[in-house]
């Protein structure tokens, strides 16, 4: 059974998204990816609306079977953490309104699945994603896009069944 996974790396300034397809034999193929950018001077509501519309457009275009998000983490800057939480909330609502099952990974779990090391660097994640999906190293300058690719490439049928509660 094949399925299409949408990976989304939330960010109020840049939200990365990526779509991959799995065939029934555990092979993964790159479909598309991109970044939804917002203006840093814009209002919070306008920025969240732009992210909502951008991801909604992607969903309409590719009709994914499942969505994969990175779990929120709290960093040293509470303002940044709060903005990330707003963004995740808007994304979860967008995905739920589109009827998608959502699988979530902690950053360390994602890194472990992609590189074998839960403390991998952004460069290591980027390299392994390029190798796994056969991508051009110059695809994007944004780590947000590579994180979204890693998310999409990491989800398994088992994760989907677990998210569905079956």
Swiss-Prot record:
Binding-site list for Mg(2+) 1: 9, 144
Cofactor note: Binds 2 Mg(2+) ion per subunit.
GO molecular function ontology, one term from the record: crossover junction DNA endonuclease activity
Entry binding sites for Mg(2+) 2: 70
Entry's EC annotation: 3.1.21.10
Enzyme class: hydrolase
CC cofactor: Mg(2+)
Keyword field contains Magnesium: yes
UniProt subcellular location: Cytoplasm
Keywords assigned: Cytoplasm, DNA damage, DNA recombination, DNA repair, DNA-binding, Endonuclease, Hydrolase, Magnesium, Metal-binding, Nuclease
Catalyses which reaction(s): Endonucleolytic cleavage at a junction such as a reciprocal single-stranded crossover between two homologous DNA duplexes (Holliday junction)
BP GO terms, sorted: DNA recombination; DNA repair
GO cellular component term of the entry, any: cytoplasm
InterPro entries with a match to the protein in the record: RNaseH-like_sf, RNaseH_sf, X-over_junc_endoDNase_RuvC
Residues at the catalytic site: 9, 70, 144
One Pfam family recorded for the sequence: RuvC
Family per similarity comment: Belongs to the RuvC family.
Known partners and oligomeric status: Homodimer which binds Holliday junction (HJ) DNA. The HJ becomes 2-fold symmetrical on binding to RuvC with unstacked arms; it has a different conformation from HJ DNA in complex with RuvA. In the full resolvosome a probable DNA-RuvA(4)-RuvB(12)-RuvC(2) complex forms which resolves the HJ.
UniProt function note: The RuvA-RuvB-RuvC complex processes Holliday junction (HJ) DNA during genetic recombination and DNA repair. Endonuclease that resolves HJ intermediates. Cleaves cruciform DNA by making single-stranded nicks across the HJ at symmetrical positions within the homologous arms, yielding a 5'-phosphate and a 3'-hydroxyl group; requires a central core of homology in the junction. The consensus cleavage sequence is 5'-(A/T)TT(C/G)-3'. Cleavage occurs on the 3'-side of the TT dinucleotide at the point of strand exchange.
Name of the protein: Crossover junction endodeoxyribonuclease RuvC
Organism field: Neorickettsia sennetsu (strain ATCC VR-367 / Miyayama)
Name of the gene this protein is made from: ruvC
